[in-house]
Structure formats: structure tokens, C-alpha cells
Design a protein with these regions (language model features):
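N-terminal amphipathic/basic-hydrophobic helices that include classical n-h-c signal peptides
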Residues: 1-3
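Extracytoplasmic copper-binding redox domains, predominantly the cupredoxin/blue-copper superfamily
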Residues: 5, 10, 26-140
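Bacterial N-terminal signal peptides
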Residues: 13-24
Length: 140
């Protein structure tokens, strides 16, 4: 009877250790993409030179951002010289086509907008005022 009790206690201990190990790993696995901040490049409204299509690094930083479903995307206008938007959709040439998934409206320098995606996928976005400013949010 003592041997069975010892095995039962050992089994419970092993299960507890496995559960504790899994729980401690879960936050680290999701923390990488729980939130992301996207900012505008300074003076990106004055010139298209920041645009990737013009050989620049992109007018938003990062140009491609990744976040988990339920994570928080913070979009901030850090450009002290201009008003910008972060509007979901695409641009064909200079013809914007919003898709209604998110739209910050006009953000003055220092203003921010938060969006919490609920569906995975690729979300292209652009600035309604400066159509060369484009980026993509990948939601996993």
C-alpha cells in the first residue's frame, strides 16, 4: 500500500511540474508580438524619398509590423512637421482605397491611436494625406 501511495504522489508531482513548465513558457511565447508601436518618419509628408517605392526605408517605422490576435497596435505620429493618418486599405498609384478595418483619422504630431486586431491576416495601410506612405501589419 505504501508503494502505491508513493507512485500516486510521484505522478501528481510530475504532472504539476509539467503544468508549471508549460505555464512559465506560455507568456514568453506570446510576449514577442503582444504589442507593437508604429511611428511616422520625420518630414515624410514633404517628400516621397522615404517611400520604399522610391528606394527609401519606408515612411512608417517599422514598415512591416507583426502582432498577435488580441495584441495592441499603437500608431503614433512622431513627425513634428506634419499631420498623418494610418488608414487600412491600399493605394493604386495615388488613388486610395480604404477598407474600413481601422482609421486613425488625422493625427497631429504626438497623437496616437490604438487598434486591437481580432482576426489574423495581412492589413495594408497608408496615409490618406500622403499616399506614398504605406505599410503592412501582419496579425498572427
Amino acid at each position: 500500500m505504501g508503494l502505491m501511495k508513493t507512485k500516486a504522489i510521484s505522478s501528481i508531482f510530475v504532472l504539476f511540474a509539467i503544468a508549471a513548465g508549460m505555464a512559465s513558457m506560455a507568456p514568453a511565447a506570446f510576449a514577442d508580438h503582444a504589442e507593437v508601436t508604429i511611428v511616422t518618419v520625420d518630414e515624410s509628408g514633404f517628400s516621397q524619398t522615404c517611400a520604399a517605392s522610391q528606394g527609401g526605408p519606408g515612411c512608417y517605422t517599422p514598415v512591416t509590423a507583426t502582432v498577435d490576435v488580441g495584441g495592441v497596435v499603437t500608431m503614433t505620429n512622431t513627425d513634428p512637421t506634419g499631420v498623418h493618418t494610418f488608414t487600412s486599405g491600399t493605394v493604386d498609384g495615388f488613388a486610395p482605397s480604404p477598407d474600413g478595418k481601422f482609421d486613425t483619422g488625422m493625427l497631429m504630431s504626438g497623437d496616437s491611436f490604438e487598434w486591437t486586431p481580432t482576426v489574423s491576416g495581412e492589413y495594408p495601410y497608408y496615409c490618406m494625406l500622403h499616399a506614398w506612405q504605406v505599410g503592412t501589419i501582419t496579425v498572427n
